[in-house]
Amino acid sequence: PVFLADVKGDLAGTTLKGEENENVKNRISKLKIEDFEYKSFPVRFWDIFGIGGHPIRTTIDEVGPDILSMMLGLSEAQEGMLNIACKIAKDNNWKLDDTKDLRLLIQYVGDNKNDFITQYGNITTQTIGVIQRCRLALENQGADKCFGQPELDINDLIQTNEKGIINILHAVELFKSPDLYASFLLWLLTNLYSKMPEVGDLEKPKIVFFFDEAHLLFNGMPNYRLKQITQVVKLIND
């Protein structure tokens, strides 16, 4: 199985059998491949907006405050405030499915900050306001559509139909919001790492990821978060 992020909308051709041309012929000759055969492959399209493929949904709880902070474009101090809010929700067994739940949580924490400061740390009205504005901006990008139920099961990406299924993320619209695009790909990686069992060395990889414009994962990223991502990527590669 393969997962491809398609930011230009030009990878759908993998559903069709290829056609011969000079470039392909030269490549086959260079690689010394004998009895080469053009084939089509089973493809499944995904789109967090649900327009160019099956919708991909997750929950605020599943994404977690670290990646959610990336999506919101928060500073380190603001991320700390979001961590406090999420810890309060966890301690009270409050489920956070979508951005509406997030809005209500942040509002509640702000309105009752004096009840939480002693146990959880400083909570400022200014930071609460910044997080709410960033959440609203995220919703205006349409990102609220990727939060809610039912959430994606990572095993849905690891399916075969005689051949490994090619999962294509239709990311033409998503790529217009680079921070959201990068955060979403990072969530997929961390989800894969946390959900997949340790199996040791395999004859074939369980799934292959191709991230178009992957440098966006690291652009402008603070060092503390860059270390986290590097660790996840190394562990998955191992």
Predicted regions and their residues:
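P-loop NTPase motor domains
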Residues: 2-5, 9-237
